[in-house]
Amino acid sequence: MKPSLVLKMGQQLTMTPQLQQAIRLLQLSTLDLQQEIQEALESNPMLERQEDGDDFDNSDPLADGAEQAASAPQESPLQESATPSVESLDDDQWSERIPSELPVDTAWEDIYQTSASSLPSNDDDEWDFTARTSSGESLHSHLLWQVNLAPMSDTDRMIAVTIIDSINNDGYLEESLEEILAAIDPELDVELDEVEVVLRRIQQLEPAGIGARNLRECLLLQLRQLPSTTPWLNEALRLVSDYLDLLGGRDYSQLMRRMKLKEDELRQVIELIQCLHPRPGSQIESSEAEYIVPDVIVRKDNERWLVELNQEAMPRLRVNATYAGMVRRADSSADNTFMRNQLQEARWFIKSLQSRNETLMKVATQIVEHQRGFLDYGEEAMKPLVLHDIAEAVGMHESTISRVTTQKYMHTPRGIFELKYFFSSHVSTAEGGECSSTAIRAIIKKLVAAENAKKPLSDSKIAGLLEAQGIQVARRTVAKYRESLGIAPSSERKRLV
């Protein structure tokens, strides 16, 4: 077989850099998009943010289109916006066509947060240790701060630091005393008894219960730090020390018999124990709050549901007319080429944002159209909805709908929800209809909330109650939905009343 050159004709899809940018912007969340826009503003001199009150003309029509896409509320899906065809690459025609199912969106003003921690002042009558840790201080640094303030020898301080290094984020000691002793410098000649003494000092630090080796010890440490006049303190100490397993199994009859307590008395003892923290370290090791900025706002006006983009989260970008006017024709100098390329990128970026906004509006409008029952009556009125339904309604591919509904949020009178929340599978009803799995979860949650606390509903009983309402669901499915709601099994929901 001889090597030869062969010419073939064919078609091949090519993903241009501009197309890649449009897809990437489509799947970004509002906060990520804000960062992307900020980076574009810093790197491209042709881009500028249009602030409220700016009254000078903007010569770039793409920027005007981006602002229009972020305005007026929608009552029905948007019509496809026309994009001009490009026959020549003149200075005024740097943009190319983006497919209609590739999109645009939003952003918000930069938020800079500063935090500081300080020691309690002499004027503070009462000091809350959590006030010092509100800025996100770690548990280890908080414990070391207390150790450094405590009077102790250098050897004890070294032991204390080693112990603190063995405490996990929940506040429990993960290593045995022998392992801690082995980690200490042998030249210090430390005995095991010394490690245990220092551990007891660590266990007196805040938060209460820190440095415990198991749940029982953690609860006992917290109870022993309560005032001696605390009602039912002795009974709580005895219950945790001797009968914690019975409490975990909710065997209240055995607890009342062994502790010789009446039902009302046992309830008060349990309430005292429930005030304790099973994971004391979590009071310090709190992750930084995650903020959600809704992309879409839904409101009701004259019995109609209106959809609009969140103006507070909308970027208002435009091409800087002054710099754009400096681009000269037939000038191949390095400076002019740079300015021309930046102008092209700026126009593409604005057009990609516009496309993102238009796609988001189309999808959000169709979701509201399908889920009017939820907006009017709540979760129990949620209808089954899949990506294919919305993709067919707006004339886009399911992958595009998946991108635009991920990490995008809708603000409704019933709360803020991710767009994916409105999609759910269906379950057949006795009448031959369909019921949303989200609606079934809402019904299960309602049934559990109204159950008798002494005789909680089992999964089989819940399945029977659903069947009585015409919804045929297997017990295993009920168990799956219950677990997804964070509801414990009936054996663990049983409590004294």
Swiss-Prot record:
Keyword annotations from UniProtKB, A to Z: DNA-binding, DNA-directed RNA polymerase, Nucleotidyltransferase, Sigma factor, Transcription, Transcription regulation, Transferase
Any one GO BP annotation for this protein: regulation of DNA-templated transcription
Gene Ontology molecular function: DNA-binding transcription activator activity; nucleotidyltransferase activity; sigma factor activity; transcription cis-regulatory region binding
Compositionally skewed regions (Polar residues) per UniProt: 71-86
Keyword Aminoacyl-tRNA synthetase belongs to the record: no
Pfam family, one: Sigma54_AID
Positions of the UniProt region annotated as Disordered: 42-100
Chain ranges for the short sequence motif RPON box as given in the UniProt record: 474-482
A GO cellular component annotation in the UniProt record: protein-DNA complex
Observed effect of gene inactivation: Deletion mutants result in reduced production of pyocyanine, motility, and proteolytic activity. The motility defect is due to the inability of these mutants to synthesize flagellin. Significantly decreased porin oprE expression under aerobic conditions. Mutants also show defect in biofilm formation.
Family matches, as Gene3D superfamilies: Homeodomain-like (1.10.10.60), RNA polymerase sigma-54 factor, core-binding domain (1.10.10.1330)
Residues annotated to bind DNA: 386-405
Keyword Acyltransferase recorded: no
Function field: Sigma factors are initiation factors that promote the attachment of RNA polymerase to specific initiation sites and are then released. Plays a role in the regulation of many virulence factors, motility, quorum sensing, mucoidy, a general mechanism for maintaining lytic phage in populations of bacteria, and biofilm formation. Positively controls the T6 secretion system by directly binding to the promoter regions of hcpA and hcpB genes, leading to their expression. Thereby, allows to colonize several hosts efficiently including mammals, insects, nematodes and plants.
Assigned protein family: Belongs to the sigma-54 factor family.
NCBIfam families, alphabetized: PRK05932.1-2 (NF004595), PRK12469.1 (NF009118), rpoN_sigma (TIGR02395)
Protein name according to UniProt: RNA polymerase sigma-54 factor
Native species: Pseudomonas aeruginosa (strain ATCC 15692 / DSM 22644 / CIP 104116 / JCM 14847 / LMG 12228 / 1C / PRS 101 / PAO1)
